C-alpha cells in the first residue's frame, strides 16, 4: 500500500472509532485486502445482544469482562458475513 492509502484507511478507522459508545476509550479498525478493498470494520464495544447502557459502560467491573476490541469485532463481523480476511491488513487506531 502507498502512504496515501495507509493514511486514508487509518483516517477511516478514526472515524469508525467514534461509533463506540465507550465513554473512556474509542478504538476503530478497518480490515483491507490486497487490492485496497475494505473487507470489514469494527469498533470497541459489547457484543451483539448485550445491553450497552451508559451505566454499564461506566462500571469497569461490568464493562471489561464483556467489551470486545475493535479488531476482534471486525474479525467477528467478517466471519458472520462469510468474508475471508486471509492476507489482509488491519488498520487500528490503538494497539491491542
Can you say where each PLM-predicted feature lies in the sequence?
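Zinc-dependent deaminase catalytic domain
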Residues: 1-96
